[in-house]
C-alpha cells in the first residue's frame, strides 16, 4: 500500500497549454512573425482554433489520419504515427509534435506553409481566421 501511495504522489507530466501572449512571444522568437507573409496574429488565431494552445492535442479524422500538437499537424501528409500511410513531408514522428518543446512543431508548420496551400492547409484558419480582424490575438502581448 505504501508503494501505491508513493506512485500517486509522483507528478505526471501534463500537456503544456500556453497562454495567448506567451504563445505569441514564443512564435515571434522563433521567426514566425511574417514568415512567408503570414502574420503573427494568423499563427496565434490558427493555434487557438486548432488546439486551444495545447501541445498534446490530438484529433482523429474521418479518413483515419490524426492531427497532432499545437498546430494539429496531420499524419497523412506531414508526420509518421506508425499507423497511417504517410508522406511524412516533415520527416518526423508525430509524437515529436506532442512535446512541450515546440521546436519540431514550429519547424514542421514552416514546412507546411511552404506547400502550395500555404496556411490554407489548416481548415480552422480558413473558417475562423482568414479575412478577419485578428488584432485581438496579439493585443497586449508586446509583440
From Swiss-Prot:
One of its GO terms (molecular function) is lysozyme activity. One of its GO terms (cellular component) is extracellular region. The keyword Metal-binding does not apply. SUPFAM superfamilies: Lysozyme-like (SSF53955). Keywords: Antimicrobial, Bacteriolytic enzyme, Disulfide bond, Glycosidase, Hydrolase, Secreted, Signal. The keyword Mitochondrion does not apply. Its main location: secreted. This is Lysozyme C. It is an enzyme of class 3 (hydrolase). Belongs to the glycosyl hydrolase 22 family. It comes from Scophthalmus maximus. Pfam families: Lys (PF00062). Monomer. It is found in: Secreted. SMART domains: LYZ1. Transmembrane segments: none annotated. It catalyses: Hydrolysis of (1->4)-beta-linkages between N-acetylmuramic acid and N-acetyl-D-glucosamine residues in a peptidoglycan and between N-acetyl-D-glucosamine residues in chitodextrins. Lysozyme C is capable of both hydrolysis and transglycosylation; it also shows a slight esterase activity. It acts rapidly on both peptide-substituted and unsubstituted peptidoglycan, and slowly on chitin oligosaccharides. The active site is at 50, 67. GO terms for biological process: defense response to bacterium; killing of cells of another organism. Residues 16-143 form the C-type lysozyme domain. Its EC number is 3.2.1.17. Residues 1-15 form the signal peptide. Lysozymes have primarily a bacteriolytic function; those in tissues and body fluids are associated with the monocyte-macrophage system and enhance the activity of immunoagents.
Amino acid at each position: 500500500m505504501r508503494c501505491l501511495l508513493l506512485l500517486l504522489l509522483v507528478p505526471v507530466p501534463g500537456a503544456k497549454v500556453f497562454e495567448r501572449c506567451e504563445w505569441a512571444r514564443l512564435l515571434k522568437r522563433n521567426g514566425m512573425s511574417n514568415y512567408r507573409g503570414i502574420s503573427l496574429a494568423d499563427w496565434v488565431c490558427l493555434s487557438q482554433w486548432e488546439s486551444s494552445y495545447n501541445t498534446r492535442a490530438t484529433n482523429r479524422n474521418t479518413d483515419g489520419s490524426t492531427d497532432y500538437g499545437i498546430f494539429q499537424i496531420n499524419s497523412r501528409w506531414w508526420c509518421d504515427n506508425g499507423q497511417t500511410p504517410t508522406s511524412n513531408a516533415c520527416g518526423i514522428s508525430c509524437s515529436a509534435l506532442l512535446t512541450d518543446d515546440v521546436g519540431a512543431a514550429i519547424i514542421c508548420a514552416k514546412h507546411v506553409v511552404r506547400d502550395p496551400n500555404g496556411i490554407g492547409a489548416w481548415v480552422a484558419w480558413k473558417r475562423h481566421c482568414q479575412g478577419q480582424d485578428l488584432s485581438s490575438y496579439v493585443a497586449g502581448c508586446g509583440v
